[in-house]
Amino acid sequence: MARVARVTEIVAGSPDSFDDAIKTGFERACKTLRGITGVRVLEQRVKVADNKMVEYRVRMEIIFVLEG
């Protein structure tokens, strides 16, 4: 059976770590997307304020299979 997948891009952040930002983004995507088959982290950035790292940000693709 043939399948068709879609890719959507999201940005997530965490004050603690890149790993936590990825987890936060994935958990949020799971609330609205069904059939997730993969995640690809495209970019990692750090927000800086007053010479301190204040937020870890990731840009990621969420891959999921379309229904029907």
Predicted regions and their residues:
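Short, well-ordered alpha-helical segments
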Residues: A2-T37
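Short N-terminal signal/transit or membrane-insertion segments
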Residues: M1-A2, I62
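A cross-kingdom feature marking charged/low-complexity
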Residues: Q44-G68
